[in-house]
A protein has these predicted regions:
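Short nucleic-acid-contacting surface segments enriched for D/E, G, S/T with interspersed K/R
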Residues: 49-65
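Hydrophobic core residues within well-ordered beta-strands of beta-rich domains
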Residues: 10-12, 63
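Short boundary/loop segments of OB/S1/cold-shock single-stranded nucleic-acid-binding domains
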Residues: 1-10
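Conserved hydrophobic positions within beta-strands
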Residues: 14-16
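Short aromatic-glycine-enriched beta-strand elements
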Residues: 22-31
Length: 92
């Protein structure tokens, strides 16, 4: 995970325009006012065990993530936590 800048956490809120709940890591494409991000999530089993089922990050949902930007890919970030459907889930 060293490719992500953990010194500068980002808080991103937007609409989910793509959602993947597959191994090894889930992902969402998050449309924010500034740009659209590819947000790397946790493995699906971890998300499910921590109370974040697939249905809560479906396309059209509004979510907030605290994430770290990828140093080499400016459109990508790794989520530390996500708030969806009124609850916050730690992903790491």
């Amino acid at each position: 995970w060293s490719e992500y800048d953990q010194e500068k956490p980002l808080t991103l809120t937007g609409k989910v325009v793509e959602s993947g709940y597959e191994h090894p890591h889930g992902h969402i494409r998050l449309e924010t006012p500034a740009k659209t991000w590819l947000v790397v999530l946790a493995p699906p089993s971890r998300m499910q065990n921590r109370g974040l089922p697939r249905e809560e990050i479906k396309v059209g949902s509004t979510v907030t993530v605290v994430a770290y930007a990828n140093r080499a890919k400016p459109e990508e970030a790794r989520a530390e936590r996500i708030t969806a459907a009124g609850k916050t889930v730690e992903l790491r």
